[in-house]
Amino acid sequence: MKDIEISQATALEPIEKIAAKVGLTADQIEPYGHTKAKINLPLASPRPQGKLVLVTSINPTPAGEGKSTVVVGLGDALNRAGHQTVLALREPSLGPVMGLKGGATGGGYAQVVPMEDINLHFTGDMHALTEAHDTLAALIDNHIQQGNALRLDPRQIVWKRVLDINDRALRQTVIGLGGRTSGVPRQDGFNITVASELMAVLCLSEDLSDLKRRVNRILIGYNMDKEPVTVGDLQVGGAITLLLKDAIKPNLVQTLEHNPAIIHGGPFANIAHGCNSVLATQTALQLGEYTVTEAGFGADLGGEKFMDIKTPVLGKTPDAVVIVATIRALKYNGGVKRADLETENVAALQQGSANLKRHIHSMQQYGVPVVVAINRFTSDTDAEVAALEAEVAAIDVPVATTTVWADGGAGAMDLADKVVAATQQPSHFTRLSPEHADLMTQMTAITQKIYGGAQVELSAKAKRQLKTFAQYGWDHLPVCMAKTQYSLTDDAHQLGAPQDFTIHVREFAPRLGAGFVVALTGNVLTMPGLPKHPAALDMDIAPDGTISGLF
C-alpha cells in the first residue's frame, strides 16, 4: 500500500482523546475539526521537563532519507515500551509538497495524521505567516508612497514578499509600475514563506509578548543616510503580531498508533534555522517523559542550528542525538549514481560511510551521546546492513537497524532501547564557540568542527557588510549558515567527507527579530523552483473527496 492509502485506511481517534492521554483538558485545546487542535498556552500548571531526543541525519539524496519516518517510528516504539512520548515536528511547506517531496509526514506505518490535512493547509499557520509577511511589505511600500517620513531608500528595502509555493519566476521582480498612483517603482522579489524571518521569529518566540518584541526588531531596510529602519520604526509591530495570534499556538495531532504529536513551524534548514517552534518543544517536554524532535536535513545544517540557535532559547540541551543513515545515501556519497542505488555495492557503502562518521564526530563535539539509526529500505541487502553496522560499531557508537516504514513502532524497538540507554548517560553540553563570539569566529568553528573544512572566505560585499554590522553591534549575533544540504561543502556536487576545503560566503542577511545573521554561501536559493516533473502532476481528488498522489 502507498503511504496515503495506509493513512486513509486507519481510523483516527478524536483529538480530545489524544489530548487526554497527556493530561490536556478540553479547555486547553481548540479543536480544528475532529482530528486536529491548537493547544492553548501557557499550560495551567508548570510540569517537570522530560528527556529530549534530537533526530538528525547524514547528507541526504534528493529523495530524502526518511528522517521524519524514523522520528515517528521511534516515538511509537518508546510509547510501546511504556515511556510516554510526545513528538515535536515541523510543519510541511506546500512548495516542496507540490514540488519534489510530495509530502512530509513520515511514511508507511510511521506517519503523523491526518496526513492530507497536515501536508496541505493544516490549521492555516503558513497562510497566516504569508499574510502577515506580505502585509508588512504592503505597509512599507505604502509608507514610501505616502510621503516617506522615515526617508526609506527604495533601493535598500530588504523585506521581500513571500509565497508558500516554489516559483522561480518570482525570484526577481519590479514593482510599482503603472504611474504615480501605483506606487514607487523599485526592484523586489519573492522568497518562499518558510524562508521568511517571521517564520524564524514565530519559532523562536517564547510567548505573544516576546513575539511582538521580536517583530518590532525586524530590519526592513535602510534610510537615505544608510541607517537601519525596523518594524518598530514603522509602528506596525502590533498589527503584524495580531495576524499571528493563532499561528503562535502549537498544533496537536496523532500518529497512526494514536500517540500525540505536536507540529508547529517549518523553517528550512538550508536557508533558515530548520527547527520547529520553541513553544512546541517546550510543551512536548512538559507533557511527556520523552520528547522526540527533529531538525531539517543533515547534522551539518539542522543539527548544528538546533544546538547553536535553538538550544539557548529553549533552555534545554538534548539528552541524546539520533543520526539517521540509509544505505542508499551512503552509497550515493560513495560515488554510486542515483540509477544504481538499489544494486548491492558494499565497497561504495564503506567508502560513503565516511560521511556518516563525519556527522557522528560533529554531534559528539557538543558532548551529547549519539546513536545511529539505519533506516532500512527493501532494496538493502543483508550484506550491506551488516557492513554498515560493523562500520559504526568499530567507532564504538550504538547502532540499530529500523524497519519503521513496514512495521511502525514495532520496527524501532531496538532503537528505542538504545536511545533510552543513551539518555541515561551523562551529557556534558559544550558550545561550539564562545558565547557572543564574532561572526567570523563562529563561521570558522562551524566550518572546521562540523563540516571538516579549513577556512571561510568572504566576498567583497560580505566584507563590507561585516564592517557595517560592527557599527550597529550585529557582528556578535549568532550565525545561521545557508548552505546546500547535499554536501558538507558549499558545492552540492562534492559528496562524501571532503577535507580542508573553503566555505565561500557571498553575503549576509541580518535577521534582527530572530536574533541571528544568515550567511549565504554558494548558490543556495531562498525561493526554490519546481522540478521537471512536479509531484503536483500526480495528485488528484475524487468526487467523494478522496485525495490521491500525496506521499
From Swiss-Prot:
RNA-binding listed as a keyword: no
Keywords: ATP-binding, Ligase, Nucleotide-binding, One-carbon metabolism
GO BP terms, alphabetized: tetrahydrofolate interconversion
EC number(s) given by UniProt: 6.3.4.3
Name the record gives this protein: Formate--tetrahydrofolate ligase
Family annotation (PROSITE patterns): FTHFS_1, FTHFS_2
InterPro entries, per database record: Formate_THF_ligase (IPR000559), Formate_THF_ligase_CS (IPR020628), P-loop_NTPase (IPR027417)
A GO MF label: formate-tetrahydrofolate ligase activity
Catalytic reactions of this protein: (6S)-5,6,7,8-tetrahydrofolate + formate + ATP = (6R)-10-formyltetrahydrofolate + ADP + phosphate
Organism listed in the record: Levilactobacillus brevis (strain ATCC 367 / BCRC 12310 / CIP 105137 / JCM 1170 / LMG 11437 / NCIMB 947 / NCTC 947) (Lactobacillus brevis)
EC category name: ligase
Positions bound to ATP: 61-68
Signal peptide: none
Protein family according to the UniProt entry: Belongs to the formate--tetrahydrofolate ligase family.
Pathway annotation from the record: One-carbon metabolism; tetrahydrofolate interconversion
